[in-house]
Amino acid sequence: MAILSAAFFDYPQDDLFVIAYTGTKGKTTASYFTEAILNEARPRHIALFSTIDTVVGPEPDQRFKSNLTTPESLDLFRDMREAVENGMTHLVMEVSSQAYLRNRVFGLTYDVGFFLNITPDHIGPNEHPTFANYLHNKLQLLVNARKVVINAETEHFDQVYAAATTTTYPESIYLFASAGFRPKRDDIDIDFRFDSQEADVAESRFTLVPVTEKAAALNIGGHYSLA
């Protein structure tokens, strides 16, 4: 159904820069943060498919409550096409393990895929039969992303990183971790470090530092890009 839906709506994903998040926890929060950041840079051009809201255009009536974290295939590609027709250039979306288990996003490639974390959850008669099945379906996002960003502190990191390397070159895989984290293996580098500065009920402050050369580089020529 996913392949047919993509073809029926004339492959709308090709007209969008697609950023996808997966993880047991944090997908919705991260998606909303990303949407907000992108909207500062490119107002009224950012679509969102999240557990809470679906945004397919800049007008109030083009924002509505979601039924699923990741829509069924027909709804997904229809909403993508509508977003394109409404002038959206970027899409931030949550991708659940159920979306892969049910083949809702089969064949969809993401420009950037984020893997936040994995813990035993969503395992049962109506979800995943085993944790191995749950992890396998989570990892499919990495296999289908052009660039990958991984939380280096996640459980089962070795399996997560190995999945990313099956289809993505190392220079397109980025790792992030807290300031004090030290990886257990010496063949990887942490690209971004973050450090919490202050947190209260009103706001949180933190620093994010690019550590490696590739993390500090922009694929855009010109000194003006650094301003």
Question: What annotation goes with each model-predicted range?
Answer:
Residues 3-170:
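Phosphate-binding loop of NTP-binding sites
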